[in-house]
Amino acid sequence: MAKYTIVDKDTCIACGACGAAAPDIYDYDDEGIAFVTLDENKGVVEVPEVLEEDMIDAFEGCPTDSIKVADEPFEGDPLKFE
């Protein structure tokens, strides 16, 4: 089943946990705030199946619950959480 991810940049504390768990999915802006590299944090590009386990590790390891994961794209409402 398809999975999508987005980072709530308002609650991200720039701890680096998501990039450590899933460096092929998450990166950081100039202030250290995480974003999804697959689609510039829009949550509309399906996470490749081979990266889903890393995405879940990042999701579960985020201390502020800023990593969001959904079965559908976040289109229209970028902070629609599952």
Curated annotation (Swiss-Prot):
Transmembrane segments: none annotated. [4Fe-4S] cluster binds at C12, C15, C18, C62. InterPro entries: 3Fe4S_ferredoxin, 4Fe4S_Fe-S-bd, ET_Ferredoxin. Its cofactor is [4Fe-4S] cluster. Pfam families: Fer4_13 (PF13370). Binds 1 [4Fe-4S] cluster. Residues 3-31 form the 4Fe-4S ferredoxin-type domain. The keyword Repeat applies. One of its GO terms (molecular function) is iron ion binding. Gene3D superfamilies: 3.30.70.20. Keywords: 4Fe-4S, Electron transport, Iron, Iron-sulfur, Metal-binding, Repeat, Transport. Ferredoxins are iron-sulfur proteins that transfer electrons in a wide variety of metabolic reactions. This ferredoxin may act as a phosphodonor to cytochrome P450 BioI. This is Ferredoxin. It comes from Bacillus subtilis (strain 168). The gene is fer.
